[in-house]
């Protein structure tokens, strides 16, 4: 028995010995992993591995010793967590001793020490012992890159786990690391080394007398000029090194006396990258420096920054110079002063003012903008700096404004003033008398009003912006100023005939200021706009078309623009609704465009109200019943043939009203939405008009029963309401409503009504929680679709229902969506519905604007397009190959729609298999297919040049053919693709260059300007192809 046990014990050790010999003598790498796996599984211990390696570790041949230690180190790297404390001690002593061995052995020794540096059982004191041994015995910079990286890893591991022990070394640790790093050149190692230096400083390791040495050993790499080689497998970018080194240089004020002269030297150099890096580093340093560090260098720093802003041709250098000046000023602003200390901020700003003030007064204004930018960069750093600069510069600029009489010069000066006014908004002042602008208030207002009344449009625009900024300063504008300002805004936004930009700016300013000064706008602007609306109504009654055509929309825009405060909304909303009602009571019916203009103004007011729950509910309960009352009255049977009905019930008008109702509903709280739904659904199902204003309607309102075609059209408004409700709002009589919608969706008498019903049904399906009721609704829909598609006059309506139900289910990943999509694919071969089915794929992949939107609380999964692509494109491709020739265009069209709306990262991996179909789609005679495919291919030319290069001959031929298409949109897209082709590898394109340049001469004479523009752009790129620097 004992003999058997001994044999069993010896057998595995024999195996271990064999693996060791295979590794050491056979130069095979596999046995090391096998030994490590056996140690982890418990078959052997680390001690047994050491014993098996005994002869190898003591072999007189260095290479054999190196292989033995390499095996042990590889095992330890995988099994260090299994080591006991006493094992770690012995191994550390062994490896430290081996650091004195032959240079061939050192790499393997370092790998072993790296493994031991990861041990949680490492006893106190051994980390210091290891690092001392490395610092003393190893000349790190003579090692290969990978071994130097190992040393940095050992240091990093010990700094992470044994910080206090290492700090006990004092400055010796810092000096040792300086010796390790000195002379490092490999970017992979530098990234780790910079991180170590940063930790040395940020974690308060002792630098002792070696501050300058540590600075020198890192700053010698500044500025970084590393350029990664092509196809660099390590992925290290120049920016990575720049940021790591910058973090080190800017980590301590103790580097300031050495770093700031270096930065000044590099800013003054001729190398653009060095200027940028130096200015950005200075910016970072200012976050940790104080006045003491900057004091001696401020004149030189200011001189360098001033020169760069005044003289540089690079916008980036100018921007970085201004940012550095801002940081310098901020640093000087936040330093705490002693009572007897010099105020460096004051003297620094005085120097800036001294060097810049006189440029503001030069007649040619050559250096006005650079000087203003410098002053504003300094002023934007702190409240103190802003006060100092503004109080010195504003009087000068105000004086200059009056000295110059030309509008362009005045505009420049006012823009500079505006820049300083904007800076004042950054700082708050408890006492309004302390505000620097208080003393200039009258002069600024005078200047602003002069600009607003100047005939120069550009000066007016700056005046409007100045008014907005001054108005944002609390208590700066008096009531008289506000009344005058409102009058100017009224004039500019309502009366000016020749400046669209001024009108837009005045409306925007009105909206901003109305939020701040609602009383002023209620008192001085709303009454004037109300009066204008009354004038419009009388013009409308007289059919005075030319008079009202331009004034009417401007008045409406002004009313909606100022509806940014709840108190103003309560005045403007009734005005707009009353105006809409009055328009429809006149003897002459308004035009469609005029009714739409009113609805668009209501839409903007609704959007403004979404910011405030109270205003949102006020708008909803005021506007929605009023709009419904208007259209319900217009849809009454006795008004079937009236002009009023024709306007209010037109598709465009109802679509605009639907948008207003949806916007007014999406932001309602569930409680308030429940109150509203309790009125609106019964209105459509039961004809309950009791909640509508002026509800003295003759006849009945029954859009789902035997109602007139006009009443059925109003289902579009029901759709807008119920499809915008929060998901947790319960809809009354839902079963009945879904049934009525289903019936109406397949009604052939009015396509507008049936489509609205189908969309409404789909919108409710999408939000309905999973369960038996949803399954019942879906079964009803499928039965209705199949019955309608089988035969009869309602096939088109049944198809529309199928399409919208499919989309509703695709968006929420419902299992039935796959079956419905297959049904849709089957219709691609249908002679009557095939083209519409192909276009249906565009709808399935697109975002809707009226129903099934995230804003309307629909369930829209974030990856629905990717999932649809994965599930259905293979079937589309198979269907294309199997389809008859006359049906293939439908499959191509559907496929093109899917691919065109697919995120490009999803499409790129599938491109090789799909590209042939896309190229075939370009030969399809359908211009929609051509345009969709071109739109899909253009970004692919930029993102997948290698794949596209394989088909360059076909691509060029097809693109050039389509550049002569009858469709302007196709011609433009084809020329854009010809332009994008130039991003393919140049050697692939050069053989085609003469042919393409000749062919692109023809569209240069195209009758459409936009086509000619694209042709010029594309031909120019082909001309440059292969030239030096292209």
UniProtKB/Swiss-Prot annotation:
UniProt-listed InterPro entries: ARM-like (IPR011989), ARM-type_fold (IPR016024), MMS19 (IPR039920), MMS19_C (IPR024687), MMS19_N (IPR029240)
Modified residues annotated as Phosphoserine in this record: 1027
Gene Ontology terms describing biological process: chromosome segregation; DNA repair; protein maturation
Keyword Cytoplasm: yes
GO CC term (a single one): cytosolic [4Fe-4S] assembly targeting complex
HEAT repeat locations: 866-904, 908-946, 949-987, 990-1028
Zinc as UniProt keyword: no
Chief site of localization: nucleus
Modified-residue entries (N-acetylalanine), positions: 2
Annotated keywords: Acetylation, Activator, Chromosome partition, Cytoplasm, Cytoskeleton, DNA damage, DNA repair, Nucleus, Phosphoprotein, Repeat, Transcription, Transcription regulation, Ubl conjugation
Source superkingdom: Eukaryota
Task of the protein: Key component of the cytosolic iron-sulfur protein assembly (CIA) complex, a multiprotein complex that mediates the incorporation of iron-sulfur cluster into apoproteins specifically involved in DNA metabolism and genomic integrity. In the CIA complex, MMS19 acts as an adapter between early-acting CIA components and a subset of cellular target Fe/S proteins such as ERCC2/XPD, FANCJ and RTEL1, thereby playing a key role in nucleotide excision repair (NER), homologous recombination-mediated double-strand break DNA repair, DNA replication and RNA polymerase II (POL II) transcription.
Quaternary state and interactors: Component of the CIA complex. In the CIA complex, interacts directly with CIAO2B and CIAO3. Component of the MMXD complex, composed of CIAO1, ERCC2, CIAO2B, MMS19 and SLC25A5. Interacts with CIAO2B; the interaction is direct. Interacts with ERCC2/XPD; the interaction is direct. Interacts with ERCC3/XPB and NCOA3/RAC3. Interacts with RTEL1; the interaction mediates the association of RTEL1 with the CIA complex. Interacts with BRIP1.
Protein name: MMS19 nucleotide excision repair protein homolog
Organism whose genome encodes this protein: Bos taurus
Gene that specifies this protein: MMS19
């Amino acid at each position: 028995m004992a003999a058997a046990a001994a044999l069993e014990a010896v057998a595995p050790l024999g195996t271990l010995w064999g693996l060791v010999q295979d590794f050491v003598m056979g130069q095979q790498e596999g046995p090391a992993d096998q030994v490590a796996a056996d140690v982890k599984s418990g078959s052997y211990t680390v001690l047994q591995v050491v014993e098996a390696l005994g002869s190898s570790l003591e072999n007189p041949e260095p290479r054999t010793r190196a292989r033995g230690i390499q095996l042990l180190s590889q095992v330890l790297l995988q099994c260090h967590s299994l080591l006991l404390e006493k094992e770690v001690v012995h191994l550390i002593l062994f490896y430290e001793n081996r650091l004195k061995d032959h240079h061939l052995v050192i790499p393997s020794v370092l790998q072993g020490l790296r493994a031991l540096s990861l041990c949680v059982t490492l006893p106190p004191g051994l980390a210091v012992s290891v690092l001392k041994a490395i610092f003393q015995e190893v000349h790190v910079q003579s090692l290969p890159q990978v071994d130097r990286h190992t040393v940095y890893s050992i240091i990093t591991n010990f700094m992470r786990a044994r910080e206090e022990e290492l700090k006990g070394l004092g400055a010796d640790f810092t000096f040792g690391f300086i010796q390790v790093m000195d002379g490092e050149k490999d970017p992979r190692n530098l990234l780790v080394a910079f991180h170590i230096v940063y930790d040395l400083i940020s974690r308060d390791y002792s630098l002792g007398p070696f501050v300058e040495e540590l600075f020198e050993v890192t700053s010698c790499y500044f500025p970084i000029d590393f350029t990664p080689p092509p196809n660099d497998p390590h992925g290290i970018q120049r920016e990575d090194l720049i940021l790591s080194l910058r973090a080190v240089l800017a980590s301590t004020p103790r580097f300031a006396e050495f770093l700031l002269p270096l930065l000044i030297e590099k800013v003054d150099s001729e190398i653009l990258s060095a200027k940028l890096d130096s200015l950005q580093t200075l910016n970072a340093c200012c976050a940790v420096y104080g006045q003491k560090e900057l004091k001696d260098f401020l004149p030189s720093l200011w001189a360098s920054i001033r020169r760069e802003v005044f003289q540089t041709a690079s916008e980036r250098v100018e921007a970085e110079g201004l940012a550095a000046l801002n940081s310098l000023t901020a640093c000087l602003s936040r330093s705490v002063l002693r009572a007897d200390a010099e105020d460096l901020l004051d003297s620094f700003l005085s120097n800036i003012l001294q060097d810049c003030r006189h440029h503001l007064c030069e007649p040619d204004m050559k250096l006005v903008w650079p000087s203003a930018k410098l002053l504003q960069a300094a002023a934007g750093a702190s409240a103190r700096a802003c006060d100092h600069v503004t109080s010195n510069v504003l009087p000068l600029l105000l004086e200059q404004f009056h000295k110059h009489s030309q509008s362009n010069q005045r505009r420049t000066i006012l823009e500079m003033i505006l820049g300083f006014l904007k800076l004042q908004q950054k700082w708050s002042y408890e006492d309004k008398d302390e505000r620097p602008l208080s003393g200039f208030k009258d002069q600024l207002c005078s200047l602003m009003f002069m600009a607003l009344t100047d005939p120069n449009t550009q000066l007016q625009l700056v005046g409007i912006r100045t008014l907005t900024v001054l108005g944002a300063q609390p208590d700066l504008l008096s009531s008289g100023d506000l009344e005058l300002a409102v009058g100017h805004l009224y004039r500019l936004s309502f009366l000016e005939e020749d400046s669209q930009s001024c009108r837009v700016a005045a409306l925007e300013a009105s909206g901003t200021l109305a939020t701040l000064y609602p009383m002023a706008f209620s008192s001085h602007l709303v009454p004037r706009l109300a009066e204008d609306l009354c004038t419009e109504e009388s013009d409308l009654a007289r059919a005075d078309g030319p008079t009202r055509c331009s004034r009417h929309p401007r008045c409406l825009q002004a009313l909606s623009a100022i509806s940014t405060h709840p108190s103003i909304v309560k005045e403007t909303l009734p005005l707009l609704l009353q105006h809409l009602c009055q328009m429809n009571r006149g003897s002459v019916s308004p035009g469609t465009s005029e009714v739409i203009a009113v609805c668009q103004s209501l839409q903007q007011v609704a959007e403004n109200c979404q910011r405030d729950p109270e205003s949102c509910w006020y708008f909803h309960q005021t506007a929605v019943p009023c709009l419904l009352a208007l259209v319900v009255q217009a849809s009454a049977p006795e008004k079937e043939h009236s002009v009023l009905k024709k306007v209010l019930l037109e598709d465009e008008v109802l679509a605009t009203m639907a948008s207003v109702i949806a916007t007014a509903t999406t932001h309602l709280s569930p409680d308030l939405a429940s109150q509203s739904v309790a009125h609106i659904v019964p209105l459509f199902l039961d004809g309950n008009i009791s909640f509508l204003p002026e509800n003295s309607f003759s006849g009945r309102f029954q859009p789902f029963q035997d109602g007139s075609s006009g009443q059925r059209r109003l289902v579009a408004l029901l759709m807008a309401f119920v499809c915008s409700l929060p998901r947790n709002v319960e809809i009354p009589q839902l079963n009945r409503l879904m049934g009525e919608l289903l019936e109406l969706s397949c009604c052939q008498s009015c396509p507008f009504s049936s489509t609205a019903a189908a969309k409404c049904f789909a919108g409710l399906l999408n939000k309905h929680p999973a369960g038996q009721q949803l399954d019942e609704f879906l079964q009803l829909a499928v039965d209705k679709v199949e019955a309608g598609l089988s035969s009869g006059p309602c096939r088109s309506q049944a198809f529309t229902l199928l399409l919208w139900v499919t989309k509703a289910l695709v968006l929420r990943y419902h299992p039935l969506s796959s079956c419905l999509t297959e049904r849709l694919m089957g219709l691609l071969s249908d002679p009557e519905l095939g083209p519409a089915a192909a276009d249906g794929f565009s709808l399935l992949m697109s975002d809707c604007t009226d129903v099934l939107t995230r804003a309307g609380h629909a369930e829209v999964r974030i990856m629905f397009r990717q999932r649809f692509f994965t599930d259905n494109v293979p079937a589309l491709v198979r269907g294309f190959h199997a389809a008859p020739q006359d049906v293939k265009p439908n499959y191509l069209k559907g496929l093109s729609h899917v691919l065109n709306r697919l995120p490009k990262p999803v499409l790129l991996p599938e491109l090789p298999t799909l590209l042939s179909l896309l190229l075939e789609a370009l030969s399809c005679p359908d211009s929609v297919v051509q345009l969709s495919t071109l739109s899909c291919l253009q970004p692919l030319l930029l993102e997948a040049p290698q794949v596209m290069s394989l088909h360059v001959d076909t691509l060029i031929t097809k693109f050039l053919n389509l550049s002569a298409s009858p469709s302007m949109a196709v011609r433009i897209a084809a020329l854009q693709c010809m332009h994008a082709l130039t991003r393919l590898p140049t050697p692939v394109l050069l053989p085609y260059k003469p042919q393409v340049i000749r062919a692109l001469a023809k569209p240069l004479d195209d009758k459409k300007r936009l086509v000619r523009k694209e042709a010029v752009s594309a031909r120019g790129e082909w001309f440059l192809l292969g030239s030096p620097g292209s």
